[in-house]
């Protein structure tokens, strides 16, 4: 009787496993019958990487879209990819079915920034980190930072007065200093120069070949990364020795009841500073170019900022409420984010076979939502090549304007970025004037699209 029962149990289990295999086989069979999106894969191994990076990448994307539509396949950077360029497809990948597409970066980037950083994860760990970051960067948390940001802005502008400067490089210093004060609070002043030195070494190695041999940029970057982790370990140790309430990002991480490890805290601090600096610096660089190229817009922005200045006493600081009296300035920021589209695309990876609009996106393939194609679609934004802040007098339709990404992986620091841009623009337009030095056309492409040579300008105080 016992043997008979065992036999029946094992038989049922075997039958159940066979049924599962049959269902899985049917699903695989049905999914493999789906066609891949149209497109070309280029040469073996290299794919179409050369075609992508030997020209303006956006020309490559636009040509593909014209030929194949809003969903197409290609092969770049050693990976088969599906590129998508419609608001509906972007929403599908980033919002509706985001659980089917995980964030993905080259392994060398993960090693450099830290494998526990928020960018590389999804699920519960990502949700937990995102809440902690938002707690430090939401309006209620950053409103008291206005005087500190204003001090950094004024100090920066004073140092540029009467000089010719590389806009992008100087804006990186400004945004780096703002990032430090928002992430480390008062502690940053003791470590600023060491942190800055390490970050510039890290930056030089970020896009280098991942060859970890003495003398290579990657090796130097990894050494700098190790030193950064040690600096942060020292800051953590000192805070624990003298516990007090901190409203900065490090304080948010340290107060987490579930408890982050020191390695997790270090990885996320290093990653957030890296992300906060370059993207915002790129936006500021483009704003100065667009305002210089559009004197009527510059005049209107200056008038708006002068009205705020006239309502204040001599030497009186800006307030959070003042930054909410800048509607035109905010539209200039929005239009810059659309026109320049600092992040042309983002990377995701299909975690299983996915069907979209009758096409198969195979498991393991990279999926790239093309933000720039959406932002420059004439059916969405009329005359997309024109810099026109007035287009944002009416809110854009959902999923058509995604400068900070979309969904659960959208940038949690966008409010801080808008604040530090607004504060700098206030003092820049009311107290200074600038002109572009050398050719004003041309774009250079790297991690971000930038005006040629980082936009050299001459800046001087107004009489």
Curated annotation (Swiss-Prot):
Keyword annotations for this protein? Heme, Iron, Membrane, Metal-binding, Monooxygenase, Oxidoreductase, Stress response, Transmembrane, Transmembrane helix
Q: What membrane topology term does the record carry?
A: Single-pass membrane protein
Q: Which GO terms describe its biological process?
A: abscisic acid catabolic process; cellular response to hypoxia; response to red or far red light; response to water deprivation
Pathway field of the UniProt record reads: Plant hormone degradation; abscisic acid degradation
State what inhibits or activates this protein. Inhibited by tetcyclcis, but not by metyrapone.
Concerning its family, UniProt says: Belongs to the cytochrome P450 family.
What name goes with this protein?
Abscisic acid 8'-hydroxylase 3
Which organism does this record belong to? Arabidopsis thaliana
């Amino acid at each position: 009787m016992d043997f008979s029962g065992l036999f029946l149990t094992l038989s049922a289990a075997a039958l159940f496993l066979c049924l599962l295999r049959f269902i899985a086989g049917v699903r695989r069979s049905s999914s493999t019958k789906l066609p891949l999106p149209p497109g070309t894969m280029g040469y073996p191994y290299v794919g179409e990487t050369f075609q992508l990076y030997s020209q303006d990448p956006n020309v490559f994307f636009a040509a593909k879209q014209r030929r194949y539509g809003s969903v197409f396949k290609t092969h770049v950077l050693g990976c088969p990819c599906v590129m998508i360029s419609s608001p509906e497809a972007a929403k599908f990948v980033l919002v509706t079915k985001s659980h089917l597409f995980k964030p993905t970066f080259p392994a060398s980037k993960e090693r450099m920034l830290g494998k526990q950083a928020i960018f590389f994860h999804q699920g519960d760990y990502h949700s937990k980190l995102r809440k902690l970051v938002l707690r430090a960067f939401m309006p209620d948390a950053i409103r008291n930072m206005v005087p500190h940001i204003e001090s950094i802005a004024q100090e920066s502008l004073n140092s540029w007065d009467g000089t010719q400067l590389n806009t992008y490089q100087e804006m990186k210093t400004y945004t780096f200093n703002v990032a430090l004060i928002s992430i480390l609070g008062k502690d940053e002043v003791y470590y600023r120069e060491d942190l800055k030195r390490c970050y510039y070494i890290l930056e030089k190695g970020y896009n280098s070949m991942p060859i970890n041999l003495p003398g290579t940029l990657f090796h130097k970057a990894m050494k700098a990364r190790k030193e950064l982790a040690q600096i942060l370990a020292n800051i953590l140790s000192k805070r624990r020795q003298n516990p007090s309430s901190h409203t900065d990002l490090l304080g948010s991480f340290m107060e987490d009841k579930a408890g982050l490890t020191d390695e997790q805290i270090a990885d996320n601090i290093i990653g957030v500073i890296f992300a906060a600096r370059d993207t915002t610096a790129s936006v500021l660089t483009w704003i100065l170019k667009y305002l210089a190229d559009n004197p009527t817009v510059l005049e209107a922005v200056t008038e708006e900022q002068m009205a705020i200045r006239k309502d204040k006493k001599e030497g009186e600081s800006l307030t959070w409420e003042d930054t909410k009296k800048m509607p035109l300035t905010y539209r200039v920021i929005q239009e810059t984010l659309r026109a320049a589209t600092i992040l042309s695309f983002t990377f995701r990876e299909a975690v299983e076979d996915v069907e979209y609009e009758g096409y198969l996106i195979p498991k393991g393939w990279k999926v790239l939502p093309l933000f720039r194609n959406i932002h420059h679609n004439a059916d969405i934004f009329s005359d997309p090549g024109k810099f026109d802040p007035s287009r944002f007098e009416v809110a854009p339709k959902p999923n058509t304007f995604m400068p900070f990404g979309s969904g659960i992986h959208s940038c949690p620091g966008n409010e801080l970025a808008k604040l530090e841009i607004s504060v700098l623009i206030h003092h820049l337009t009311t107290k200074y004037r600038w002109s572009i030095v050398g050719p004003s056309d041309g774009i250079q492409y790297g991690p971000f699209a930038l005006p040629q040579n980082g936009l050299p300008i001459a800046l001087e105080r107004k009489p």
